Amino acid sequence: MICQTYDVVIVGGGAVGSSIAYHLAAEPAFDGTVLVVERDPTYQKCSTALSWAGIRQQFSTPECIGMSGYGFEFYRNAPTWLAVGDDALDLGYVENGYLLLADEINRGQAKANFDLQSE
């Protein structure tokens, strides 16, 4: 049965919208209803699919570093976590590294950010 009202309406079903919906559904304390509104029902032309799949890894605040780390853990485990029965999900996720360039003026800050990220 289709609901006429929802507790949460998420506009956009790309990575962020889908993540919010997934985490709400996975949260035992949440018993509400969720609607994801995405103009592309195939998800082939949503913002995430068109982003070239670049995933930023270098951040300079503990909060962003923590969110990035969780994101990478999720991508690594998505085939298992999002499997339906014996059908694992293939995101096509491949870790290729990330290149960050800095000139001499910004080299110190880039190094400090790298050190913070590596803690």
Predicted regions and their residues:
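Glycine-rich FAD pyrophosphate-binding loop
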Residues: 25-48
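Beta1/beta-strand and adjacent pyrophosphate-binding region of the FAD-binding site
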Residues: 2-16, 35
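Flexible, glycine-rich phosphate/dinucleotide-binding loops
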Residues: 17, 43, 108
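Dinucleotide-binding Rossmann-like beta1-alpha1 core, especially the glycine-rich loop
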Residues: 52-119
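Short beta-strand/turn micro-motifs composed of small residues
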Residues: 12, 38, 102
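Local beta-strand N-terminus motif with an aromatic residue
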Residues: 6-7, 32-33, 83-86
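Short, flexible hinge/linker loops that cap or flank conserved catalytic cores
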Residues: 2-3, 28, 93
